[in-house]
Amino acid sequence: MSTPDNRSVNFFSLFRRGQHYSKTWPLEKRLAPVFVENRVIKMTRYAIRFMPPIAVFTLCWQIALGGLLGPAVATALFALSLPMQGLWWLGKRSVTPLPPAILNWFYEVRGKLQESGQVLAPVEGKPDYQALADTLKRAFKQLDKTFLDDL
């Protein structure tokens, strides 16, 4: 996945974008076969919740049993890096331009929203996955579920 050339995205802003993308993406079961985001978001949320305590427990357990400090720290750092890897991936995905097949579907969903009377801001440049997430979230709130039939 490559980021668009017209946007400068630094390493740390990807985490912020990933957090925003995970909150924006609609976790609908009908989207799961097409988009991997549902699984990645669920696992990232799980990792954010449970990996820090697991890292602390692992560190304390290995030190209490007289284990070496090096492997204990390495294991704890690996456990702490898992949520960051998920957020980084989501951030990269959010700024990735849509492929042609999904791009056509994106414009169809936007057209259905506009036909239903919704006012949408014009799309600037090539739409990315964040724009798709915003559009899908709005479509799930405003439209009936039949807009997914041609997915």
Swiss-Prot record:
It is a multi-pass membrane protein. GO terms for cellular component: plasma membrane. The chain crosses the membrane at residues 46-65, 69-91. The keyword Cell membrane applies. Its main location: membrane. It is found in: Cell inner membrane. Residues 1-45, 92-151 are cytoplasmic. Keywords: Cell inner membrane, Cell membrane, Membrane, Transmembrane, Transmembrane helix. Residues 66-68 are periplasmic. Belongs to the UPF0208 family. This is UPF0208 membrane protein YfbV. It comes from Shigella flexneri. The gene is yfbV.
